[in-house]
Amino acid sequence: MSIARRTTLSKFLIEQQRETNNLPADLRLLIEVVARACKAISYNVSKGALGEALGTAGSENVQGEVQKKLDILSNEILLDANEWGGNLAAMASEEMETFFPIPANYPRGEYLLVFDPLDGSSNIDVNVSIGTIFSVLRCPDGKQATEESFLQPGTQQVAAGYAVYGPQTVFVLTTGNGVNCFTLDREVGSWVLTQSNMQIPADTREYAINASNARHWYDPVKRYVDELNAGKDGPRGDNFNMRWIASMVADVHRILNRGGIFMYPADKRTPDRPGKLRLMYEANPMSFIVEQAGGAATTGTQRIMEVQPTGLHQRVPVFLGSKNEVERVTGYHDEAK
C-alpha cells in the first residue's frame, strides 16, 4: 500500500460523515481524541522497563484489584486528552469509583465516554498483548451528567472500540455501521485502515475460557465445554482448540479475525456476583463490535446489550463471538432454567 493511497483514521471518519451523514462532527472529533490517547498509551507500554512504569502502584481500584503503574498512567492519559475538547459531558473508568464530570473551566459536550484504560494489565510485566476498551453514549440530560446518565443499555451506544498493544498496535472501531481496523504506523504517527467491514465466521473450532475454573462452572457451561473437549468422538463430531490469553482485547481480536467464542461465565465461587467482567466498559463495547461483525453476545440468558445497568461497575457473565456457538451455549442455559 503506497503512502499516497493510504486511508487514515481521520480521512475514514470524514468520509463516513460525508457519505452516511450519521456521524456528527463532535463524535468524529471525540473518536480521534481517544485514538490519539491510545497512541500515547501504546508509546508508554512499548517502553516497558525503560519507562519505569512496570510493576504495581501500591493501590487498589474500586474493584479491589491491585493497580499497576500503567493502569493509573493510562487512565490519566485518557482523562487529560478528553477533558478539554468540548465533546464530553463526563467520563467513567474502571480505575475510578465515581464518574468524572468535565471541569467547569472547560466547555462541555453531549457525549459520555466510558473506558477500561488498560485491559489485561496482569500481562503487563510479561510482555503479553494488552489494550484499551471504550464506549460512547449520549448524555440524556444534555451537558449536565449524573451517574444515572451513564446507566443506559448497550443498545444506546453510538460508538465503541478497542486498541490492542501487541506486535502491532491496532485500533478497532464501530459507529454502528460495520467494524474496521486501523494499524498504527509509528514512522508517521497515523492510524491506517488495514481491515474493512470485518466479519466473524458463524462457525468455529476455537474457544477461549479460563479452564482452571472448570470445577466452579455451572452445568450449562460444563456441558458445552465437555462437548467441545470430546472432539470427533463426542456429540459435536469435530475437534476444537482452546485459546486463552487472559486479556479480553487480545482474545476478542483473535475471534474477530478468525472466529471463535469467548466465555467468562459466572461461577459457584461467588454466587452473589454475576460474572467478573464489567458491563459498561468491557461487555457492552465488545458486544457492540461483535454484533456489528455478524457475531452474537449474551450473558447466557440475555442479549448483553439489552441488560439495563444498575451501576457503573456492574458485572455480567459474557459469551460472545461466532453466532452459532453463542446461540448453542445460550440454549443450554435456557434448557437448565
UniProtKB/Swiss-Prot annotation:
Signal peptide (from-to): none
Residues that hold substrate according to the record: 119-122, 210, 276
UniProt remark on cofactor binding: Binds 2 magnesium ions per subunit.
Catalytic reaction annotation: beta-D-fructose 1,6-bisphosphate + H2O = beta-D-fructose 6-phosphate + phosphate
UniProt keyword annotations, A-Z: Carbohydrate metabolism, Cytoplasm, Hydrolase, Magnesium, Metal-binding
Organism of this sequence: Burkholderia cenocepacia (strain ATCC BAA-245 / DSM 16553 / LMG 16656 / NCTC 13227 / J2315 / CF5610) (Burkholderia cepacia (strain J2315))
Record-stated family: Belongs to the FBPase class 1 family.
Subcellular location per the Swiss-Prot or TrEMBL entry: Cytoplasm
UniProt protein name: Fructose-1,6-bisphosphatase class 1
Pathway(s): Carbohydrate biosynthesis; gluconeogenesis
Gene name of the record: fbp
EC assignment: 3.1.3.11
GO terms, molecular function: fructose 1,6-bisphosphate 1-phosphatase activity; magnesium ion binding
Binding site for Mg(2+) 2: 116, 119, 282
BP GO terms, sorted: fructose 1,6-bisphosphate metabolic process; fructose 6-phosphate metabolic process; fructose metabolic process; gluconeogenesis; sucrose biosynthetic process
Residues engaged in binding Mg(2+) 1: 94, 116, 118
Class of enzymatic activity (EC top level): hydrolase
Subunit note: Homotetramer.
Cofactors that this protein relies on: Mg(2+)
UniProt cross-references to InterPro entries, sorted A to Z: FBPase_C_dom, FBPase_class-1, FBPase_N, FBPtase
GO cellular component, one term: cytosol
